[in-house]
Regions:
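Active-site neighborhood of phospho(di)ester-bond hydrolases with catalytic His/Asp-centered motifs
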Residues: 5-6, 37-41, 72-75, 144-146, ...
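Aromatic/His-enriched, Gly/Pro-containing loop or helix-boundary segments
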Residues: 188
Length: 197
């Protein structure tokens, strides 16, 4: 069994510690028994430079520190748009297979807005379009709806979300292979929704 945390942030995201760096992420992951970490915020220009300086890439999709601790390329993107007469605010975790794909994702996002002001950038892109465009870059990219029950910024959020995965991702639903249930729910709550089976 691998214990992984695939949704983290670097020090350039709002409301994060300035002490967040690769060394501290590794240190505290080991203390907590986490075997694999996401890099967080790979779209942020300063953070991706720290990732490149502190992690070594190989052909497996896993990057490693000098001591061999594994990371996977990961970021979170906030999508804010209107659909069916309602404002939608959906956060998605994105996993990338390598640094070349990260650069292509970043290049695409730069055509839609800024990436330098926050580790979790915001774009006015509907979720189906977002998934479709990322799949044009690489079929190995994973888009994972983040903290799906959070009221304001999630797939099932009561204030700005949807009633089903299909309502949100439409024809791209088949490419959603995982959901992050987040801290706003527990397994018993999630088991009550059959579409999560």
């Amino acid at each position: 069994m691998i214990i992984a945390d695939l949704h983290i942030h670097g020090r350039y995201s709002q409301a994060t510690s300035k002490a967040l760096d690769i060394a501290n992420l590794e240190k505290y992951a080991k203390i907590k028994g986490v075997d694999l970490l996401g890099t967080g915020d790979f779209t942020h220009p300063k953070w991706i430079e720290e990732i490149k300086q502190n992690l070594t890439e190989n052909s497996t999709g896993i990057l490693r520190t000098k001591t061999g601790f594994p990371f996977i390329l990961q970021t979170e993107i906030s999508l804010i748009y209107s659909q069916d007469g309602k404002g939608r605010r959906i956060h998605n975790v994105v996993l990338a297979p390598d640094l070349e794909v990260v650069q292509q994702i970043t290049d695409y996002l730069l055509t839609k807005g800024r990436i330098d002001y926050d580790g979790r950038p915001i774009f006015k892109i509907p979720c189906p379009e977002f998934v479709s465009e990322l799949r044009k870059i690489s079929k190995k990219i994973e888009v994972i709806p983040a903290h799906i029950w959070t009221p304001w910024f999630s797939l099932f959020g009561s204030m700005s979300g949807f009633d089903s995965i299909k309502d949100c991702f439409q024809d791209q639903t088949k490419h959603i292979n995982a959901l992050e249930t987040g801290l706003s729910s527990d397994p018993a709550m999630n088991w009550r929704l059959s579409q999560l089976d």
